[in-house]
Amino acid sequence: MGSISHLPAYGHRLLPVLIDEIARDEPDRVLFYTPRNGQPSQGYDEVNTKIFANSINRLCGWLDSQLGSPAGPRTIAYIGQNDLRYFIMMIASTKLGHRLLLSSPRNSVEGHVSLIKQSGCEFWIASSGLDHHEFLQDLQIPSVEAPELPQLLDPTPVKPYVYQKSWNEGKSDVLALLHTSGSTGLPKLVPVYLETAATVDGFHLMEPTNGKRPTGVEWTGTRQLCAMPLFHVAGICLGLYSAVFFNWTVVLPSVGPIMQHVIEDALDHISLDSAFISPSVLQDISKSPRVLEKLSKLKFITSAGGPIPQSVGDLIHPRVPIMQTMGMTEGQWLASVVTHPDEWAYYYFHPRTGVEMRPYSEDLSELVFVQNPKLSATQPVFKTFPELDIWETKDLYSRHPKHPDLWKYEMRRDDLIILSNGEKFNPLAAEGKLISHPWIAAAYLTGRGRFQTAALLYPDENSLDKSDDIITDNVWPTFEEVNKSLPAFAQIHRDFVKIVRTPFPRTPKGTLARNETEKAFTADINAIYDRSTHGKPSVHINGTTEDVVRSGIREAIETVSGLVDLKDDDNIFTRGFDSLHVIRLAGLLSSAFDQPLEVEAGTIYTNPTISQLAHTVWSHLEHGPQDKVHHSEVTREMLAKYAQAFEPPREAKEHIVLTGTTGEIGSYLLDVLCNNDKVAKVWCLNRSADAFQRQVDSAKSKGLSSSWKSKAKFVRYDVASENLGLSQDGLEEIKNEATAIIHNAWEVNFNLPLSSFEPQFIGLKSLVDVCRESRQKIRFFFVSSISAAMNWPSDLLGPVPEASIPRFDAPINGYGSSKLVAEHLLSKAARSGVLSLSILRVGQVAGPVKTLGEGSIWTRRDWVPAIIDASAHLRALPLDLGSASILDWIPIDLLTEVIGQLVVPVNPVVGQENYYNLLNPRTPSWTDSLPGLKARLEASFSDTFEIIPLQEWISRLRGAEKTIVKEVSEGSSETAIRAQSGLKLLAFFEMLASGKEGSRGLEWAKANTLAQSSFLACMEPVSSAWFDTWLKQWGY
């Protein structure tokens, strides 16, 4: 036997030894607060280390009396009220050498029996008030009632039971036998060894990253409510481990199911620093302003067990910081580091966890543990499964659009719904949106193996008495919002919504048990699909004449699709009719006539107009009531007869090469092009190898589509290589198919001389060579810049023309000169007949105002946000912006709409060269926006802001440089950190003030541009509403 004369190092401490050690050395250290008699209103009892260790010894004596002493190692089970007895039972059984099975009270009889058989359980212990189950008698397993908690916590000293094993002798002893949730079948046994628990203690060994330690260590000393089931790994980790390993004080919840009132009771009756609350309970709290207000008293909350719905987090986060935790039964507590408060939905996993994110789909990656001998002390999953080198968690995450080390939990692999057509989608976000409705407590989307998604809704307790129709009517606007975010194949039709009055099965951690829900509600789900196929027809057609049939088919099409104003000869598929509409229309028509008639989907596909379909149906009605409408010879003859007459001439589609899609303009422009029905394909040429993933992440963060309607093809290219570094096949494909090239990629650096841009000209030549060898004349669009002409002498020569710039002194810097040189080179190519040229001179690009994703922001690297950030630190705004005082800015999401209209015009422009000056035609001044800016910033900082001349503002910023640098180094001022960008642009601001950036009266010709872009012609001016949007993006 070993000795306990001293504690081993972190990661090698055995819980039974450690508890006795701290009870001896720190007897008054409070580990837990338990609600007296299980009711917070009666107060809380302190449980210090001495009392806790004594209660374990008392239970050891009781177990010996029940099992016989010495009993020898046995497997025993405990099921009880959600109180401290779980932890006492775990340590006591370990001291005695027994294995303790913790079977969830929510398990079915089948689940309990399965776990008993898997573990070889011989003895069953339950707290009072819990059913001992008849199945125990059938299995001939003796059962007994556990001592009450006050009895165990009696401070009177009892005989000590000393755990005398060394690390090597005790590390393989079982602390508890846990089990999986059984959400995809029967629960599976998962042993937790003392060595497994000690890996959580190994958090102490992990070095700080980004200045933070793993959460368990970082939150040392917190007093936290552990509102989780204590038999579950979440409750054990943040209840037992946190108190013993990390010196937390853990407040235990009241008895009974953990619901909103449990949290409120604790908040009302004990002082707390933080709380550990499941996502399902946070969902309920988000609907209660009263509890939300009480929650705001905490320093932070943490959660685990599933994703917090975005709508729920958005309500809670402004009131109390959310700091998420991640764990799993097989891997215990996964070491993560607290992220920035605004990134509450994301995890930063500590490098010493040894996890990898392996791509699973275009936008999801799976969390995978890879065994590393050097990380043995901090990889618990390989204590659970020592025979494995890799363990796939089946947990899928999405990467942060800007911070590649941050990951957001999205779903389990098993949560994906795969429809009968092979399309698959993630239902969790949609379910989260639905439960944000105040009348809905839970939502479940189904459809695996079916042709259509269906929804089951369980009403909130305050809405249970309302009729199904009233609930559906009230919730339907939320469904319409949900459908906007779902792919077309997954959208939910009103006929596929059912209200249920039985709660959905839940896992112990409170998440939806999807497999059990599917089984429990099989009848309801089948009823939805049966109703859609055999339900009472909502359209009746008497079939007396072909005109009547035609009118009835029109009504049926409107019923299933909402399409109105269809002409008899319109092709329904060009108007948005899809495969789901076809299935529903076939079912509706099959039951709409008085005579028996079966209309197959194929009949609709081969008769895509109202006239064709009506004629086909009418002809078969005429042949007799038993005729079946199918792909018969008659149908083929009818198709041959009408196909040519009704098929509209195909409009040529655009095949576009777009360079630099991962940049700001490129991201929005790709979205615009792919949403244009006249565009068939977009080759996305980028330099980086991971352009596709970056594009997906960027699109998701900006609120843009990341599917691009299957039109986008990502190709890596090298601007300085021959043939752009493309493969021969890739190059030939572009030469054979491309109709247009948009050259958007260009190095942006206003400090470089013209010579530094020479690689750009090499790439430009390669693109022109593609045009020279293409099968058709390419329309070439070059994204230029107004900096190519900012020194244009408009006082002498008038507005900057929509034409080639003949003066080589017009650019303001090397960047502008590079753009001007490119314009002239391309003009030469156009005049030689190689290509048709359009020059797009882009002005000041502002932040987005219509797309509102998390990543849709005006980047702080730009000079306008730099002025705002510096002004926030100075508490002063400049009176003017010098030569930039006229606000002819265009928001980036509107600019790309303009470009899209020019690239894919309604009426193509004739001519070999076209020049467009892309500036807002409506030009308010900076001073017009000052009152709103001043008021917004004063409200944000609760302070007064001055308005001072630009030159004085620059002087103040220069004078504040030392203070800003000092505050940044001390980390004492967020405004100082932001103001740094203004310091870097001081020279630029000086140029604005001196007017060297160009005349204040510089004018730009726009007649041709406005004639070709109605979008630009109707554009709003820069407004206070736009500034409010940008200020919100910047956090003001």
Swiss-Prot record:
Residues 21-343 are annotated as: Adenylation (A) domain. Residues 544-621 form the Carrier domain. Disruption phenotype: Impairs the production of fusaric acid. InterPro entries: ACP-like_sf (IPR036736), Adenylate-forming_Reductase (IPR051414), AMP-binding_CS (IPR020845), AMP-dep_synth/lig_dom (IPR000873), ANL_N_sf (IPR042099), Far_NAD-bd (IPR013120), NAD(P)-bd_dom_sf (IPR036291), PKS_PP-bd (IPR020806). One of its GO terms (biological process) is biosynthetic process. The keyword Transmembrane helix does not apply. Keywords: Multifunctional enzyme, NADP, Oxidoreductase, Phosphopantetheine, Phosphoprotein, Transferase. It holds the Pfam family AMP-binding. SMART domains: PKS_PP (SM00823). SUPFAM superfamilies: Acetyl-CoA synthetase-like, ACP-like, NAD(P)-binding Rossmann-fold domains. Fusaric acid is phytotoxic to plants such as cotton and banana. It has been shown to induce programmed cell death in plants. In addition to a mild toxicity to animals, fusaric acid exhibits acanthamoebicidal, antioomycete, and antimycobacterial activities. The modification O-(pantetheine 4'-phosphoryl)serine is found at S579. Contains three distinct domains: an adenylation (A) domain that activates the substrate amino acid which is subsequently covalently linked as a thioester (aminoacyl-S-PCP) to the 4'-phosphopantetheine prosthetic group of the second domain, the peptidyl carrier protein (PCP) domain, as well as a thioester reductase (TR) release domain. Non-canonical non-ribosomal peptide synthetase; part of the gene cluster that mediates the biosynthesis of fusaric acid, a mycotoxin with low to moderate toxicity to animals and humans, but with high phytotoxic properties. L-aspartate is suggested as fusaric acid amino acid precursor that is activated and further processed to O-acetyl-L-homoserine by cluster enzymes aspartate kinase FUB3 and homoserine O-acetyltransferase FUB5, as well as enzymes of the primary metabolism. This is Non-canonical non-ribosomal peptide synthetase FUB8.
